[in-house]
Amino acid sequence: MIPLAAWEEVIDASGVAPRIEAMLPIGVRRRQLSVRTLLAGLCLAQADHRPAHLTRAHRALTALPEQDQARLGVVTAWKDGPHLLTYRQTERTFGLIADALAKDEPDGLPSAALAGICDDLLEASIPAEFKDASRSLAVDWTDLETFSRPPPAKGGECADPEASWGHRKNNLPGPKDELFFGHYASAGIMMPDEGGRPLPELARRATLSSCRHDPARALVPVLTAMPAAGIPLGDILADSGYAHRDADAWALPLRAAGAALVQDLHPHDRGPKGTHHGAVIANGSLYCPNTPRSLLELGPLSRDAAPEAVTAHDARAAELARYKLGRITADDPDGYHRIQCPAAMGKIRCPLRPASMTLDRGRPEILQPPQHPQECCTQQTITVPPEITAKTAQKHNYPSKAHRRSYARRTGAERGFATAKDPASNNITRGWCRLMSLTPLMLSITCLLVVRNQRILAAWYTRQAENQRRAAAGLSPKTRKRRRKTLASLATRPP
């Protein structure tokens, strides 16, 4: 089990305890339970694979050694003798914290104070050696069902007025889509940069929002606030659920904050989607008007594709890249940039660009150029406004080999929630936290992610020590056997 000193170090490094104490009301009698001790108790309870119940936190604090109890104020000297912390005191202190961090008029989103407290706690759980090791984040959201019952069908209030109906998918037999009553929990997990060294997949940012709010829009202010905190944004790895949002809601604010998007496009956003000065808009890029339709409609590779299919797909993606109009300038302050015909750049042969016809015949050739060429074929360059590919433009050509390899890192977000939702440890199903409203839930989920980070770090250091031992013995690092099974692999497996 992770020792108490580890939680105290994280809480002290974050600096959140004094800030919260300053927000709490001051009574006639000094509170026995401090914010620092309560946060340590919440982490201790969840580190012991317990639910986020205040009774569990109280039990964890009262089970500490006598020396730690005296040091943390769990046992204090009253005029009648030593006094052991009671559950009522624990509940009272947590209630004061929740009231201080909540909004005056709850709307299903965290207050600025609550968001800052949770950000600082998560940032403090990341060791200094990994803070600058990567700027890439894999993002995702998951369901967090409230303990409250839904409001009556005939109308009326419920115990958790900030909760709302949401949609989730399950892996159980039967229907895959279902409704739940609660909130969406979003998180950003640190992933290695492209070509960077491996590092532990630590949760760096998280937020909670009612299901009446879009989780993608709720996560944007959390990510865009990171540069102001001295954490520059790098690659943001997201699935099509994020990429399908309006550009103003997701892509544009992240690009303005310095992020590079690496995401899967929604099926409705793939393929040709109009033209700009004659150039075909497809998959976030502009292509020659004579690009073969089959290349423009090239989709992503299936997960269980055979090696021959992978090779053929990569060859077609590389051929498609030759028809792409190349960028020759960076974005100006208004988001405009200029691109050039692929024949003028020497990527294909086209009669409309006589100089390109001197290139070798290994390049694709336009056999039937348009009789009435448009600006993309007659001008040296064309200007692209920011709104043309605002929603779908990203770091790599889609769906190229480079994009597939870079996007493969996004599974870290799935693993992040899988470790936090493991039934063998902390299962955040309904009843995991019985406190109502968004503020107590967000504090609890943040403490859980801090605990998860410490578990990941402990496993990381153990694995590195084992790899060093094996290297000293002349052995290669130990790897895990791939256990994913497909119908094709099962059918061809020998008996």
What are these regions (language model features)?
Residues 1-53, 66-122, 463-466, 471, ...:
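Dynamic "connector" segments at or just before major functional cores
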Residues 277-340, 386-436:
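Short amphipathic alpha-helical "interface-anchor" segments enriched in bulky aromatics
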Residues 270-278:
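Short, charged, surface-exposed secondary-structure boundary motifs
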Residues 30-39, 56-60, 88-258, 262-269:
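Polybasic low-complexity intrinsically disordered regions
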Residues 148, 163, 328-399:
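Long, low-complexity, polar/charged, intrinsically disordered or flexibly structured peripheral segments
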Residues 9-28, 163-166, 398, 425-433:
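Short amphipathic alpha-helical segments and their helix-coil junctions
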Residues 26-37, 176-178, 408, 433-442:
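Structural motif
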Residues 405-489:
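Basic, amphipathic alpha-helical segments enriched in Lys/Arg and hydrophobic/aromatic residues
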